[in-house]
């Protein structure tokens, strides 16, 4: 049996040490009941409410595997696209551009040649005028698509990997073109609904106020992120990532909000398929998506999922078959299929400022502790 007080104490000590104002840690081992640990408060304000298991966090780049990668896998299963389809065959606006001949596989492995990040939001929404309707979001997506079309590649495609939000911006658009519906609707109907959760989803700009009110009526709260200088306010219930915000809160690289237990509904679908048990995902495809793509020199990436490579946020003990992802706001998920161990850490380490990077040292320590307590010494 895991030493629950020891794990709880470690999470509480992280709050004391200023790693984050509060956090939720959810662990599932061997398909057993989920253990949820909480510590701290919603914000740095001493009067703030305590974090609860139902606290909702901005998941940041966990959007990539939970939404975009899962959506791509489902679309491949349905025959709507293939891993090696060229992006220009799906987004003809990119025909003739430097990135046009890259494939879905290149974006999933972060080996497309695109830069890692660009501040497109400064051009799309120069006055922080966030799109508030589907038509506004469509125009913003078209503007971002043109900007990516005009990007010069900064390394030879496939020669190495460079973690890129730009590639996942395109993957989000690919999901919409191949499915024929907005990304938030595809996620709601084809992923969250089938996984059996209503506590995980995108928050388009016009839904933000209602989202906060609904969360509170359910007895949960939304953890704030940063005092954002671009938008001139404390962010709570609206996406922290500026490029995602400039697209109206819905994008392939960021935008999901949810609870730790809700995250486990999606990771559980991946784990079940990995072991050829009933799942919405195809077992062979899941094995391919979670296997490190060694054809890219020096890369730790599988298809949209990362794999452990020292020094890793996963710590030293998770098996080589493990896969996971990090989120900039202070979130992470790691899945060890050989030990059937799923670990979700949600926090708002960027509150009140993104300059706090203490979580980098904490992540491997908490993953090692959880492994020892649930699996045993390694």
What role is predicted for each listed range?
Residues 35-37, 333-334, 340-349:
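Short, well-ordered beta-strand elements
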Residues 249-255, 322-334, 348-353:
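Glycine-rich phosphate/pyrophosphate-binding beta-alpha loops
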Residues 97-320:
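Short, surface-exposed loop or secondary-structure junction motifs
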Residues 272-275, 281-293, 310, 352-378:
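Short, gly/Ser/Thr-rich active-site loops of penicillin-recognizing serine hydrolases
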Residues 2-59, 80, 146, 241, ...:
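Short, conserved catalytic-motif segment at the N-terminal edge
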Residues 3, 7, 59, 63, ...:
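Hydrophobic (often cysteine-bearing) scaffold residues that line and stabilize catalytic clefts
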Residues 13-26, 46-106, 155-166, 251-254:
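Short active-site loop at a secondary-structure junction
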């Amino acid at each position: 049996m895991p030493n629950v007080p020891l794990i709880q104490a470690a999470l509480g000590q992280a709050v004391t040490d200023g790693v984050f104002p509060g956090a939720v840690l959810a662990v599932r081992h061997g398909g057993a009941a989920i253990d949820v640990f909480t510590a701290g408060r919603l914000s740095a304000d001493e009067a703030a409410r305590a974090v609860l298991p139902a606290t909702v966090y901005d998941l940041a780049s966990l959007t990539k595997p939970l939404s975009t990668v899962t959506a791509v896998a489902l679309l491949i299963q349905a025959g709507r696209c293939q891993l090696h389809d060229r992006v220009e065959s799906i987004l003809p606006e990119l025909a003739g551009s430097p990135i046009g001949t890259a494939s879905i596989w290149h974006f999933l492995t972060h080996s497309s040649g695109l830069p890692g990040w660009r501040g497109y939001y400064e051009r799309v929404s120069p006055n922080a005028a966030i799109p508030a309707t589907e038509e506004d979001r469509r125009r913003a997506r078209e503007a971002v698509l043109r900007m990516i079309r005009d990007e010069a590649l900064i390394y030879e495609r496939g020669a190495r990997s460079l973690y890129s939000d730009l590639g996942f911006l395109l993957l989000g658009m690919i999901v919409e073109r191949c499915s024929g519906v907005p990304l938030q609707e595809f996620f709601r109907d084809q992923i969250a609904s089938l996984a059996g959760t209503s506590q995980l989803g995108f928050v388009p700009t016009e839904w933000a106020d209602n989202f906060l009110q609904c969360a509170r009526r359910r007895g949960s709260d939304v953890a704030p992120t940063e005092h954002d200088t671009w938008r001139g306010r404390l962010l709570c219930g609206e996406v922290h990532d500026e490029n995602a915000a400039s697209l109206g809160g819905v994008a392939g690289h960021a935008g999901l909000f949810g609870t730790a237990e809700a995250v486990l509904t999606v990771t559980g679908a991946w784990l079940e398929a990995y072991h050829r048990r009933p799942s919405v995902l195809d077992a062979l495809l899941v094995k391919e998506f979670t296997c490190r793509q060694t054809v890219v020199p020096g890369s730790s990436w599988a298809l949209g999922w990362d794999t452990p490579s020292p020094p890793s946020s996963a710590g030293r003990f998770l098996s080589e078959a493990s896969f996971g992802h990090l989120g900039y706001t202070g979130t992470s998920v790691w899945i060890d299929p050989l030990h059937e161990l799923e670990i979700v850490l949600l926090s708002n380490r960027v509150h009140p400022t993104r300059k706090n990077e203490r979580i980098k040292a904490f992540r491997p320590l908490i993953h090692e502790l959880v492994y020892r307590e649930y699996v045993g010494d390694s």
